[in-house]
Amino acid sequence: MDLDIDQMEKKWLKYWEDNDIYTFIPSEREKVFTIDTPPPTVSGKMHMGHSFSYSHIDFIARYKRMRGYHVFFPWGFDDNGLATERYVEKETGIKPTDGNVEHFINLCREFSQASEKALIEGWKRMGMSCYFKDYYVTSSPESVKISQSMFLDLVKKNRVYRDLAPTIRCPTCKTSISQIEMKDEMLKSKLVYINFDVEGSKLTIATSRPELLGSCVALFVNNEDERYKNIIGREATVPLFGHKVPIMGDESIDKDFGTGAEMVCTFGDQNDLDLWKKYSLPLRISIDKDGKMNENAGPLNGLSINDGRKKIIELLKSEGFVVKEEDIKHSVNTHERCGTPVEIFIEKQWFIRYLDLKKDFIDSGRAVKWIPDYMRTRYENWVNGLKWDWCISRQRYYGVPFPVWYCSDCGNTVFADDKDLPVDPRLQPPSKRCDKCGSSNLVPERDVMDTWATSSLTPRIALSHFGLFDKYYPEDLRGQGHDIISFWAFTTIARSKIHDNTIPWLTLMISGNVFDMYGEKMSKSKGNIVDIYAITDKYGADALRFWASTVSQGEDIRVKEQDFVRGRRTVIKMYNANRLIDILRNGRPLKNVDEPKHPVNLWILTEESKVVKLVTDSMDNYEVSKARSALDVFFWNTFCDNYLEMIKAIVQAANEKNDLGTVDETIYTASKVMRDVVKMYAPIMPFITEEIYQSIEIEGKKKSVHIDCWPMENREYVEASEVRYVTSIIDKIRAAKSNAKVSVGTPVRKALIKCNASIAEKYRDMLSRMMRIGSIDIEDSDKLEVSVEP
C-alpha cells in the first residue's frame, strides 16, 4: 500500500474548504435539514467523548446531504460562564477576586478566542462537516442580545422573579447553582450517633452533618413509630449549643435509618429544606457563602466545613454526647463542575418560575422523537423529580449580564428596553430613570446569568446568526450525550415551551458515554485517558470515526484498539479494492453499460441492491451501526472475497478470447458497485471515500462524494440463485484448502467437486482460475462436497 493517510486527510480538508462543499445555501425549491449542533466549551482539549458523540451527528449530516437536503450544520462555542473562568484561573493563576475584574474578563475573552481557533482545527481534522467559516459564540454581542431579550420576555410572561429564597451554592466556585448542575455521588462519611437531652431523658439521633448542630431547629421522628410517640411535642436541648428545639412527627422520616430520629438543620440537605418549609421552622445559618463556619457555629467559627466536622465530633466526645460512630458511604449532592458537596443558603437570586409547567414539559418531551426512545424516560424522570424553580443568577463575572438596575430610592427593579440590548449594567449607565419614582439613582445588578440560561437558546442563537430563525424553527435534529439530558435537552425544551409554545427540534438523538477498554470511566487520576490525537496520528480520522460507529445510539462504548485497527484495515481494503479494478481495466476507457449480461455481474448488482436498501433503511432510522455492519459484510465478503476474485478470472479469460464486451461490462459493473460502496461508507469515513471517489472515472460525478446522490435501490432483483450457489462452491473450496493446510492463494493440483453439475460446469474455468486449481472433476450430487489434492 502506498497511501499516505495523513497527507490524504490534509489534501481533502483543504479541498472541501476551498470548494465550500459544506456551505449552507438553500433555495426556496430545495429540501432543508437543520441541526442544533452542541457548542462545546473552550476549556481544555478535545477528548474521546467529543469524537464519539459529534461523529454521530456528522454521520447524519453527511447522509442527509447525499439524500438531497441542504444541511444547516452550524458550529458554535459555549465560551461564557464558570467553565471558562475556571480554565483561565488554572492557566494563569489569576482570579477575579484578585482585584481587577475587567482585566480578568478580558483574559477570559483572549483565552476563549485562542482556544477556539485551536479547537476548530481539531474538529476539522476529525472530519466534521460543519460550516466553520462563520461560527457563533455565546459571549458575542448578538448572543448576549438574544439571551437578554429572552430574559425580558420571561419578565413579560411573569416567568422570572427575584427573591430571598433557599438556593444551592457551591462553596468552592463561590456561586449559586441550579438543580440542573448537581450530580449524585457516593461518598465516604461518618454517621455520628448523638444524645440530645429531653427533659431529663436522652434521645439519640444519627447524623452525617454534626457540624450543623448550631443550625438545628427541630428533631423529627415518624408519627407511626411506637418508640417515640410519647415524646412528640416535647422539647430537646441541642448539645454544646444549649438552645431548645421542638420534637415533631412526620410520615417522611425513615424509621429504619439510624435510630429513627433525626435533626433538621438549616440546611443540611433537601429533606431539611422540605421540612423547614412545611412546618415554617426558624432559620439558623451557620455556614457562610465561602463555605466557612460562621458565628452561629460557636466554637467552629472560621473553620472549613470538613475541619468543623472534625472539631465538633471531638468536642461532643469530650462532653460525652457521642454514643457511637459508623463508617458509611452515602449519596451526596455535588457540583458537577468541581465535585464539591453543595450547600443550601438563603440568598436573593433570580429564578425562572417553571415548577407549575412540569406536565407541559412532559408533553413537549413526548412530542419530540427520541433516538433511542427509552432515553425519553430519563428526561421524564428528571422533570417529575424537579423540586426547585431554576436559579439562573450566578455570583461570577464572565457571563451574560442581567439587563437590570435597582432604584436606590424606592427599591424598584428597572429593566432595560429591548432597543438598548445588548447592555452591561456593570459598565453602562441606564438610558432611563426609575419608572416608579423617577429617580436617576440606579445601581446595576452585578450577578451574571447561568451559562445554561444562554445555552438553552442555541436553536434561536444559531439560526438567528444567519437570519434564519423565523424560517427554520423548530429545527430537525439535536444530537447530544445522555449525560446532559437534564442540562441541555431539558432546558432547551423548557425555554422553547415558555417562549414559543413549541418544541425546539423534531428529533433528539442521544449518544452514550465513553469508557476505557475495561469499562472504567477515564480520568487523569486513573491514568487511563486516551489521547484523541494519538489515535488519529496512528490510525487516521476515518478509523476513529469507524470506531464511533460500532454501537447504537444511546449505548456506551469502550475504547478498544482492535476497533481502530479494523477501521484502518477497512481504509486499506477500500483503497486496494479500487486499485485492483484499475489494474483489471488496464488503461481501457470506462464504457457505460446499461444492461449487463454476465450472470456474475447481474448477481453483484442484485446483492448490491439488497444492501443499499438495508443501509438506507438503517440510516433513515438513525441506526448507523446497523448500516455499517451490513455494509461491512457486503464489502468484505460479497464484493471483495467473492466478486472481485471471480472477475479476476472472468477478465483474464475474456482478454484471452478478445471478448472486450465482457471486459468492458465487468469493469464498468465493478467500478459502479465500488462507487456505490464508497458512497455508502462516505458519511462514516469521509477521507478515504473522497480519495477513491475522485479516482473513479464514471459518468455523473459531482465535485465531491459528499454532495453526490445516495445510491438508489433502482433495479428489479434478477434471478441470482445460480451465482449464489457458485459462491457456496467457492466457500467449500476455501474450506477444503484450509483443511489440507494449503493457503487460499496457493495452487493445488486437483479438486473434486460434488454438486449440481449443470451449474458448476458453466463456471469450471472461472473456478479453476480463481481458486488456482490445476484440474477440476465435477460429480453430480444433491449434496455439496469438495476435496482437494495439493
From Swiss-Prot:
The keyword Ligase applies. One of its GO terms (biological process) is valyl-tRNA aminoacylation. Its EC number is 6.1.1.9. The gene is valS. This is Valine--tRNA ligase. GO terms for molecular function: aminoacyl-tRNA deacylase activity; ATP binding; valine-tRNA ligase activity. The lineage of its organism: Archaea, Methanobacteriati, Thermoplasmatota, Thermoplasmata, Thermoplasmatales. InterPro entries: aa-tRNA-synth_I_CS, aa-tRNA-synth_Ia, Anticodon_Ia_Val, M/V/L/I-tRNA-synth_anticd-bd, Rossmann-like_a/b/a_fold, tRNAsynth_Ia_anticodon-bd, Val/Leu/Ile-tRNA-synth_edit, Valine-tRNA_ligase_type_2. ATP binds at K524. GO terms for cellular component: cytosol. Catalyzes the attachment of valine to tRNA(Val). As ValRS can inadvertently accommodate and process structurally similar amino acids such as threonine, to avoid such errors, it has a 'posttransfer' editing activity that hydrolyzes mischarged Thr-tRNA(Val) in a tRNA-dependent manner. ValRS has two distinct active sites: one for aminoacylation and one for editing. The misactivated threonine is translocated from the active site to the editing site. Belongs to the class-I aminoacyl-tRNA synthetase family. ValS type 2 subfamily. Keywords: Aminoacyl-tRNA synthetase, ATP-binding, Cytoplasm, Ligase, Nucleotide-binding, Protein biosynthesis. Gene3D superfamilies: HUPs (3.40.50.620), Isoleucyl-tRNA Synthetase, Domain 1 (1.10.730.10), Valyl/Leucyl/Isoleucyl-tRNA synthetase, editing domain (3.90.740.10).
